[in-house]
From Swiss-Prot:
Biological function: One of two assembly initiator proteins, it binds directly to the 5'-end of the 23S rRNA, where it nucleates assembly of the 50S subunit.
Organism of origin: Shewanella piezotolerans (strain WP3 / JCM 13877)
Identification of the protein by name: Large ribosomal subunit protein uL24
InterPro entries reported for this sequence: KOW, Rib_uL2_dom2, Ribosomal_uL24, Ribosomal_uL24_KOW, Translation_prot_SH3-like_sf
Entry keyword annotation includes Cell membrane: no
GO biological process, one term: translation
Keyword Coiled coil: no
A Pfam family matched in the record: ribosomal_L24
GO molecular function, one term: structural constituent of ribosome
Keywords annotated in UniProt: Ribonucleoprotein, Ribosomal protein, RNA-binding, rRNA-binding
Length: 104
């Protein structure tokens, strides 16, 4: 089955502490989760590792967010949207359900 949300898609958060925020998908995990730039930031306590040249301290990084808590953002309508699939010229393409435009 093809993925409705893919890397580099702009998404909007529907539920959780970051509700209403938008960001680009940087990674899609096989567990049904996504990593979105600037969303679901957590503080991680990093131990120093002199062999790798990593300094210790508290690092802020993106944690995975459940795919059901985000929706793809339609820039034409300015709202969250649903995605459908159809065949055009023998290729399977994604389109927005609200206005039938292709997802870029």
């Amino acid at each position: 089955m093809a993925a409705k949300i893919r890397r580099q898609d702009e998404v909007i958060v529907l539920a959780g502490k970051d509700q209403g925020k938008r960001g680009k998908v940087s990674q899609v995990l096989t567990t049904g989760k996504l990593i979105v730039e600037g969303i679901n930031l957590v503080k991680k306590h990093q131990k120093p590792n002199p062999q790798l040249g990593v300094a210790g301290g508290i690092v802020e990084q993106e944690a995975p967010i459940q795919a059901s808590n985000v929706a793809i953002f339609n820039s034409a309508t300015g709202k969250a949207d649903r995605v459908g699939f159809r065949f055009e010229d023998g290729k399977k393409v994604r389109f927005f359900k609200s206005n039938s435009e292709l997802v870029k």
